[in-house]
Amino acid sequence: MYIVVTRSFPPEVGGMQNLMWGLTCSLAKYNLVKVFADFHENYKEHDQKVSFSIDRVGGIKLLRKHRKSYLVNEFIKKNKNVSCVIADHWKSLELIKTTKKKICLIHSKEINHKKGSFANRRILKAFNNIDQVVANSEYTKNLAVEIGIDENKIIVINPGVFPPKEIDKSSINEAENLLKNKNPRLITVSRFDKRKNHEKVIMALRNLKQIYPNIIYTCIGYGEEEENIKKLTNELELNE
């Protein structure tokens, strides 16, 4: 049995949520999987449709971490067939007390703290008790080595994707009409969060349009920055 401990899981939407969902679904094809995930308002409808067991943990962030770790530790004590624990973040494994194999995914931002800082020392202490580190890119692996994580523990596995679904012809025609005579073509697929920096691309687009009058930038997603992005696009007269 595999245990998956995650802070990012559907029905919440996002890149990490998709990654952990895909990983869990793939693992469930070959072995039993138990998931410990954060609470989400619409989790019941979602969780009823899956083939594996999910425990949801709510409450404020600090207490939620401790509660989840307690539940995982108790589950491992009672289930001798657990072979490993897989987590989306080093903090998800920080309080897990077990001799079972521990695997942690890394993505770069969460480990990017100055070497020797309090955060860095805390990270290294956590990774000293982790057996395998899975980096999402060579860049992330090199960053991990640079901040002090044992290189021998790290392997690189690029994020996977589900096989593409067949797209209906009307959607293809709509996309072709939208992109007709447009070049270069830029696209961002993400949540509309401040840290994604959509506004910087849009501001650069105004200058690029002087060089490439037929350039198009398509933003796909949703989020709290949506209205601000639309407002900036209008102000720069880029909303064709």
Regions from the language model: what does each represent?
Residues M1, D168-R185, E237:
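Nucleotide-sugar donor-binding and catalytic loop/hinge architecture
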Residues I86-S92:
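Short His-centered aromatic/hydrophobic patch
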Residues T6-V13, L19-R64:
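N-terminal strand-loop element at the rim of the active site
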Residues L178-K196, I202-L205, T218:
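Conserved donor-binding/catalytic core segment of Leloir-type glycosyltransferases
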Residues I220, K230-E240:
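Nucleotide-activated donor-binding/catalytic signature segment of Leloir-type glycosyltransferases, i.e.
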Residues K114-K115, V145, G160-N177:
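Acidic anion/phosphate-binding donor-loop and adjacent secondary structure
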Residues E12, L63, S92-E94, I103-F118, ...:
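A short, histidine- and acid-enriched strand-loop-helix "catalytic/donor-clamping" loop
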Residues F39, Y139, G160:
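Carbohydrate-associated surface elements
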